[in-house]
Amino acid sequence: MKALWALLLVPLLTGCLAEGELEVTDQLPGQSNQPWEQALNRFWDYLRWVQTLSDQVQEELQSSQVTQELTVLMEDTMTEVKAYKKELEEQLGPVAEETRARLAKEVQAAQARLGADMEDLRNRLGQYRNEVNTMLGQSTEELRSRLSTHLRKMRKRLMRDADDLQKRLAVYKAGAQEGAERGVSAIRERLGPLVEQGRQRTANLGSGAAQPLRDRAQALSDRIRGRLEEVGNQARDRLEEVRDQMEDVRSKMEEQTQQIRLQAEVFQARLKGWFEPLVEDMQRQWANLMEKIQASVATNSIASTTVPLENQ
């Protein structure tokens, strides 16, 4: 049933994500390449990557693993958002407490909406798996259609809230810049290592999220290759065995043919031995008969000639 869940989920996500790829780019035109934005992109990139695997690897995937990977990516995204927010709070400097509280509240609300969107998406996938498990082989077209519609709505809502959070953080950052004009140089020196660290963390997280699945795909490929080689060796051994059997049959047939030929020659010799004396005896009798007939004819001819002479 887990294999069925993976097979149904992956094609569905393929269609949803393929339709929404351009839409995601259009909804975040002003991306500043912040770590939290990269983490959010990895959340969707992971789903896109799953659908590129072969059917055999998709059958190997367990729904619990997909959920765990999504959970890790969600936590990474929210962690980066909190880290970026904390970084901006440290830069606010002498800003009015009322302004600080208002900005913090707006960012917190946008952050909560984004987290709720990702949590809702993960829960919806789990609910879909449970519904598939209870259908016991029945048609899942209606269920897939409903989930597809829900995922499209969730994608739009997620990108809308991400865009809203991006704008709130931009305002937050603007307030920080206004409140810390005298410390611009120091802030830039601090932001440089943080940005580089975020990029490095992004690269590590990106490769770390996909590496377990790549390892499983490679292991499965090795098993399939080994199985094919084993089947090929068995087929070759069987072919050699059949060839040997055919050679034995051919040898036996040639041997039997030779025996039949010898038996026929012996039988022919026997027949010749039986009939030759009869033929020779018949030839002798025929020759004697012909001699007797010729002698009788000659005697009759002489007798016929003698009688007329006596009458004269």
Curated annotation (Swiss-Prot):
The modification Phosphoserine is found at S139. The modification Methionine sulfoxide is found at M135. Disulfide bonds: none annotated. Sequence repeats lie at residues 72-93, 94-115, 116-137, 138-159, 160-181, 182-203, 204-225, 226-247. Heparin binds at M154, R155, K156, R157, S221, D222, R223, I224, R225, G226, R227, L228. Residues 72-247 are annotated as: 8 X 22 AA approximate tandem repeats. InterPro entries: ApoA_E, Apolipoprotein_A1/A4/E. Residues 202-282 are annotated as: Lipid-binding and lipoprotein association. Its main location: secreted. One of its GO terms (biological process) is melanosome organization. It comes from the Eukaryota. Keywords: Chylomicron, Endosome, Extracellular matrix, Glycoprotein, HDL, Heparin-binding, Lipid transport, Lipid-binding, Oxidation, Phosphoprotein, Repeat, Secreted, Signal, Transport, VLDL. It holds the Pfam family Apolipoprotein. Residues 270-282 are annotated as: Specificity for association with VLDL. Residues 1-18 form the signal peptide. GO terms for cellular component: chylomicron; extracellular exosome; high-density lipoprotein particle; low-density lipoprotein particle; multivesicular body, internal vesicle; very-low-density lipoprotein particle. It is found in: Secreted; Secreted, Extracellular space; Secreted, Extracellular space, Extracellular matrix; Extracellular vesicle. GO terms for molecular function: cholesterol transfer activity; heparin binding; phosphatidylcholine-sterol O-acyltransferase activator activity; phospholipid binding. Residues 150-160 are annotated as: LDL receptor binding. APOE exists as multiple glycosylated and sialylated glycoforms within cells and in plasma. The extent of glycosylation and sialylation are tissue and context specific. Residues 258-312 are annotated as: Homooligomerization. PANTHER family: APOLIPOPROTEIN, APOLIPOPROTEIN E. Homotetramer. May interact with ABCA1; functionally associated with ABCA1 in the biogenesis of HDLs. May interact with APP/A4 amyloid-beta peptide; the interaction is extremely stable in vitro but its physiological significance is unclear. May interact with MAPT. May interact with MAP2. In the cerebrospinal fluid, interacts with secreted SORL1. Interacts with PMEL; this allows the loading of PMEL luminal fragment on ILVs to induce fibril nucleation. Belongs to the apolipoprotein A1/A4/E family. This is Apolipoprotein E. It comes from Rattus rattus (Black rat).
